[in-house]
Amino acid sequence: MRIEDILNTNKIIGVIGNSGSGKSSIVSKIKQCKKIGIINSDVIKCDNVKDQIEYYVREYNYRLKELQDRENEIITMLEIDEELLERSVYSISESELFKVMIASIMLCNPDNLIFDEVLFSLDYKAKTKLLKLLMKLKKFFNKTIIIVCPNIDDIYEFIDDIIIIDEGKILLYGNKYEIYSNNYDLIKEKNIRIPIIVEFIKKMKDNGINLDNVDNINELIKTVYREMRWYFEI
């Protein structure tokens, strides 16, 4: 498959692979494509939050007046308040800084955003909140969002598709449920981490209990309850 095939799909796509699998080379190729906004620690160029958000549109001579409505829309969507705009980027929390990085790139209106292992120093609560914000960005701004991560369990609930990298190549790409349902043994053979929730559903199936494909613990509890209720009512 071509790298271009994963772009402009209006999906959230997870990119995973073992250490040394060649993730970085594949990600580098993605970054070279057109209309890619890259979110990483190199994004920060200014001390003041508002200046940072407007840095790239100034750098590339966008007309700020025409972008004011868009800036307000993005700031509102990302829940960046007025007080935060006047602060130093070095005095805000890591999760707030992450939102500032997104806003500064989003203002340039790229079609695709790539998050290159920047989410995962956050605690669980902050990470979950920000991943939910990415789902809103995808929906309301029609963006393709690519998340490179070391741990599939961190993002499984929030992604639509998955890319699995092995030996410097794209081993598998497609809908997350189909990838794990149709390629479970291959992924195991490659010793690539499988989401805990997928492992649980597979073990239940191996023991004769078929559960719906779900991607979060709340839905798993519901589907287990439905199945067990049916079982005990027989």
Model-derived segments and their meaning:
Residues 46-61:
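Q-loop/switch helix immediately C-terminal to the Walker
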Residues 74-90:
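Conserved ABC nucleotide-binding domain
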Residues 102:
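Hydrophobic anchor residue at the start of the ABC signature
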Residues 149-150:
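H-loop/switch region of ABC-family ATPase nucleotide-binding domains
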Residues 155-157:
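A short, surface-exposed alpha-helical micro-motif characterized by mixed small hydrophobic
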Residues 169-193:
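Conserved beta-strand-loop-alpha-helix hinge in the C-terminal portion
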Residues 187-234:
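ABC ATPase nucleotide-binding domains
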